[in-house]
Amino acid sequence: MLRPPLAKTILFPSSKELLTNTMDAILFEAAQRGEVNFLQQLLRENPLILDNVALLSTENLLNVALITGNVSFVKEITRLKPHFVKELNQDGFSHMHIAAAHGHVEIVKELIEVDPNLCRLEGREKRTPLHYAAIKGRVEVINVLLCSCPECIVAVTVERETALHLAVKNHQFQATEVLVKWIRENNKDEVFSITDEQRNTVLHLAIWKRQRQVVELLLDSRLVGSKCHEPLRPHCTGCAANVPQ
């Protein structure tokens, strides 16, 4: 039995699809390289190009610029399309979560300028940008977020973890030190008494994980709260999963 010619069995993309895919690739490459002038040139030729990419592409242009840390490109995109900053990627992370996790402090500042409420935005597992900064040990980002949104210090995840819990769980001593210092200076002693889902305070976690420096830091501050003297319950679960990479 004769088979039809191969050419007839292949579905070729239309010229419109090819053009869209090409423009997507060009824009994403510009985002990776931070080529703002090239972006402006494309916009002069097609003022709707950013909207077209947002509608037709599964990837987010701003995410690409965020991950590579191109501040000028991020500034230009947020200036042109401020509503982009509230969009989530396919994994459920906001742009602020990604910037905080990667330690891009200038981008974090820029996003705060666009919308200060992004500091308290909850993502997967109710984690805020401060939670991700603590997990990754991004000290500069922690300082910026606390300065812009002090109430974030008491925000808890679905497992009732504060940023301090997460810093200790992930062995981020510098982040822990910065958080403890901020808590002390801002009279937020109650944070030391907050227990997670397993009823562990940060002191419980530090003792269980044998983090001597953290234990000494907490005891030296004398701000560990009465709940820290309850029996230790070493039932810490993993917490580094589901973090923007």
What are these language model-derived features?
Residues F38, S72-F73, E106-I107, E140-V141, ...:
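Conserved ankyrin/ankyrin-like repeat signature
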Residues M23, S57-T58, G92, K126, ...:
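Start-of-repeat signature of ankyrin repeats
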Residues L43-L48, E76-H83, K109-L118, N143-C152, ...:
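Ankyrin repeat domain, specifically the short helix-to-loop turn at the C-terminus of the second helix
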Residues V53-L55, L88, L121-E122, A155-V156, ...:
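Ankyrin-repeat boundary/linker signal
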